[in-house]
Amino acid sequence: MVSGLRLASRSGEEGWLKPAVARLGPPRHRLRNLRTESPWRSRGSVLFCSGPGRAGRAAEPLHPVCTCGRHFRRPEPCREPLASPIQDSVAFEDVAVNFTQEEWALLDSSQKNLYREVMQETCRNLASVGSQWKDQNIEDHFEKPGKDIRNHIVQRLCESKEDGQYGEVVSQIPNLDLNENISTGLKPCECSICGKVFVRHSLLNRHILAHSGYKPYGEKQYKCEQCGKFFVSVPGVRRHMIMHSGNPAYKCTICGKAFYFLNSVERHQRTHTGEKPYKCKQCGKAFTVSGSCLIHERTHTGEKPYECKECGKTFRFSCSFKTHERTHTGERPYKCTKCDKAFSCSTSLRYHGSIHTGERPYECKQCGKAFSRLSSLCNHRSTHTGEKPYECKQCDQAFSRLSSLHLHERIHTGEKPYECKKCGKAYTRSSHLTRHERSHDIEAGCSDSAYNPSTLGGQGVWIA
């Protein structure tokens, strides 16, 4: 609870004053009154609220009796020498009035509007101070020029916990570089590892720690009471709980598909309009989502920021990295409700579901053949064109599919990533391992039969 804030005015042509700020009172006292006069006038301005022993009593007026423009409670001469502008610089902490979320909730609408008006004028004058510093070449004494000082003030406002107090204040301050980013929703803080962008530096720093595996808030301690899923923050739980409500608040006006979040429906509507506002600077390919464009750019740079700690394999996408980690742990969290088959990634489960439904939405325009996967259709098209864009660097053999090239490269490297857990035999392809594992199942179930497992393809051959 703020018990008082006195903003000193500036007068005279020399020096800039450091505003005097009253100390914060006990936060437990309820705010009852909030008054102000416009700050930075010829008289001292007072922003006060009632507290213990201060009900309805404002601070005493200041007396501008010194030629340097300083104000004093008592009409006595200024005994201090004229201070340099560097010593009397205006500090953001000196003029900022911070309410806790509980205190802010106690204010009525008129008090909040009054507070915003005071802070808006305060910020304008702080920006003016920064401009004056620059005009007087005082920024030579600082590491940053006056322009950056003004931006620093606004940045401090943006990073405040009480966003509800400062958000509207900052957005209405003119001639500030950060103002454009705030009002348009642009995010100036970009992660150099994955390209994800954030509004605040604090969120960016927290995100960078996630790449290193460090958890600044410890383990996930906030649990969803309905499904038992854990989250690292309360907002994460609240956002997740919306999906349990079963009542999506947003609906596509074109197809009627429902969504829980506004940004989701906006992103979905681009599939109808064909809008792709995000373009790759190198090849010009366009995307509907900014994140997809950033991920695509890694195909040009070859960047693979995600590395597996078990085998050292690197990945370009976080989803591919997480799916790969499950090959080491054996985790298959996505289960089919019709046949109980489990998968390590949701995409595989979705494709598997088309087997039961028989749905094949992707059709070749040349021959009419339909596919359940878009990637399968793309691979099929190469059979019509004869194009083989994927070429092996070691033997110059070309392939129509990228996956076929990767399988071929294992011949040169000798890599056999698919290993049988029972006998240790390894294979270059997962399908070969699956065939081999069936031989163990047949041996276990038919040990009394005349069965001879053949090494050819890992399949068993019955002897008549």
UniProtKB/Swiss-Prot annotation:
This is Zinc finger protein 669. It holds the Pfam family KRAB. InterPro entries: KRAB (IPR001909), KRAB_dom_sf (IPR036051), Zinc_finger (IPR050331), Znf_C2H2_sf (IPR036236), Znf_C2H2_type (IPR013087). The keyword Metal-binding applies. A zinc finger (C2H2-type) spans 189-211, 222-244, 250-272, 278-300, 306-328, 334-356, 362-384, 390-412, 418-440. GO terms for biological process: regulation of transcription by RNA polymerase II. Gene3D superfamilies: 6.10.140.140, Classic Zinc Finger. SUPFAM superfamilies: beta-beta-alpha zinc fingers, KRAB domain (Kruppel-associated box). One of its GO terms (cellular component) is nucleus. It is found in: Nucleus. GO terms for molecular function: DNA-binding transcription factor activity, RNA polymerase II-specific; RNA polymerase II transcription regulatory region sequence-specific DNA binding; zinc ion binding. Residues 90-176 form the KRAB domain. Belongs to the krueppel C2H2-type zinc-finger protein family. Keywords: DNA-binding, Metal-binding, Nucleus, Repeat, Transcription, Transcription regulation, Zinc, Zinc-finger. May be involved in transcriptional regulation.
